[in-house]
């Protein structure tokens, strides 16, 4: 095995391509659990081998605990892939409650974002995850997204987090490839890209997969990209990365990603209602057309 694909020695316990799944809403704003099951099944049919529910793309700041629990149960009923539940907050006690209840509902792991807005110290970040670890009986995926949280998890903090029993993986949305190399090598944690545009670069430094918004539109070529990389067919992987670049640009460039993910499902004919809870607003006609053009340019829908 060449050095370029040594990352295969790392397990991918939660899958390779994991859509950060939207939460379908009815026109009145209620969660549409039946449609959630439809979307989950479609994403798995597309090539996803894991799903993340109740994340930011799933409008988690506006959904309530009972809805989060029911969403985990609904999705678990219809798919045979790992289902990870977002359980993050800037309130440690609330995070612990979410972890406990979504685990009880059947989540295979929890995705816990670094506490946001309050900008805690590195010691505070560690203590937050330590408290979550003490209440967890399933794996914890650390979510590092400084563009949203206002704080970056330091290398030394990662080293200490890796010593916690249930911390097993990282969703890295820092955009810092060089930093990810050191963090991954010095912690031994399983690494996932949290940035669609950096999917292939993250694979090249040892990530096992991606937690993705664009997988609502492109799970199949994203899975093929990972498989090509595994075979050492870098030219094929590069070609696939280039192919999906237009839809990545479309879904990243003109609106909140959850909005654009719902637009993509509408364009694909999977889901008609794109209602969102305030303060987010569903996609407008222009955003839908931008996504449609991106899907066409990537060869994901007919011209």
From Swiss-Prot:
Name the residues annotated as catalytic in the UniProt entry.
Answer: 143, 171
A single Gene Ontology MF term assigned here is: 4-hydroxy-tetrahydrodipicolinate synthase activity
Q: Which residues bind pyruvate per the record?
A: 57, 211
Pathway given for this chain reads: Amino-acid biosynthesis; L-lysine biosynthesis via DAP pathway; (S)-tetrahydrodipicolinate from L-aspartate: step 3/4
Entry GO terms, CC: cytosol
Q: GO annotations under biological process? A: diaminopimelate biosynthetic process; lysine biosynthetic process via diaminopimelate
Give me the disulphide-bonded residues: none
Entry keywords, A to Z: Amino-acid biosynthesis, Cytoplasm, Diaminopimelate biosynthesis, Lyase, Lysine biosynthesis, Schiff base
The yes or no answer to whether the keyword Membrane is present is no
Q: Where is this site: Part of a proton relay during catalysis?
A: 56, 117
Superkingdom of source: Bacteria
Reaction equation(s) it catalyzes: L-aspartate 4-semialdehyde + pyruvate = (2S,4S)-4-hydroxy-2,3,4,5-tetrahydrodipicolinate + H2O + H(+)
Where found?
Cytoplasm
Q: What is its main location?
A: cytoplasm
* EC id: 4.3.3.7
InterPro entries assigned to the protein according to its UniProt record, in alphabetical order = Aldolase_TIM, DapA, DapA-like, Schiff_base-form_aldolases_AS, Schiff_base-form_aldolases_CS
Specify the signal sequence span.
Answer: none
| SUPFAM superfamilies, sorted | Aldolase
**Broad class of enzyme this protein falls into:** lyase
Its biological purpose: Catalyzes the condensation of (S)-aspartate-beta-semialdehyde [(S)-ASA] and pyruvate to 4-hydroxy-tetrahydrodipicolinate (HTPA).
Q: Which NCBIfam families match?
A: dapA
Q: How does it assemble?
A: Homotetramer; dimer of dimers.
**What PANTHER family does the annotation carry?**
4-HYDROXY-2-OXOGLUTARATE ALDOLASE, MITOCHONDRIAL, DIHYDRODIPICOLINATE SYNTHASE
Tell me which family the UniProt entry assigns to this protein: Belongs to the DapA family.
Its protein name is 4-hydroxy-tetrahydrodipicolinate synthase
- From what organism does this protein derive? Bifidobacterium animalis subsp. lactis (strain AD011)
């Amino acid at each position: 095995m060449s050095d370029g694909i040594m990352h295969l020695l790392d397990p991918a316990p939660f899958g390779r391509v994991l859509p950060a799944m939207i939460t379908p809403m009815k026109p009145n704003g209620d969660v549409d659990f039946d449609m959630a099951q439809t979307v989950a099944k479609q994403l798995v049919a597309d090539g996803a081998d894991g799903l993340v529910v109740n994340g930011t793309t799933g409008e988690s700041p506006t959904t309530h605990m009972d809805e989060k629990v029911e969403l985990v149960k609904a999705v678990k009923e219809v798919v045979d892939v790992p289902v990870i539940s977002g359980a993050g907050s800037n309130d440690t006690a609330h995070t612990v409650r979410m972890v406990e209840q979504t685990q009880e509902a059947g989540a295979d792991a929890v995705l816990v974002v670094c506490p946001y807005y309050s900008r805690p110290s590195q010691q505070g970040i560690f203590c937050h995850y330590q408290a979550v670890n003490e209440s967890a009986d399933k794996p914890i995926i650390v979510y590092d997204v400084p563009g949203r949280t206002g704080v970056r998890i330091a290398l030394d903090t990662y080293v200490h987090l890796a010593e916690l029993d249930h911390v097993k993986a990282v969703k890295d949305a820092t955009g810092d490839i060089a930093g990810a190399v050191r963090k991954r090598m010095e912690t031994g944690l399983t690494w996932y890209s949290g940035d669609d545009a950096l999917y292939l670069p993250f694979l090249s430094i040892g990530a096992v997969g991606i937690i993705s918004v664009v997988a609502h539109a492109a799970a199949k070529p994203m899975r093929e990209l990972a498989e090509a990389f595994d075979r050492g067919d870098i030219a094929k992987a590069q070609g696939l990365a280039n192919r999906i670049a237009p839809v990545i640009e479309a879904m990243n460039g003109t609106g909140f990603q959850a909005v654009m993910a719902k637009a993509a499902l509408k364009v694909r004919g999977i889901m008609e209602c794109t209602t969102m809870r305030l303060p987010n607003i569903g996609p407008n006609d222009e955003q839908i057309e931008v996504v449609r053009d991106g899907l066409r340019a990537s060869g994901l829908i007919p011209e």
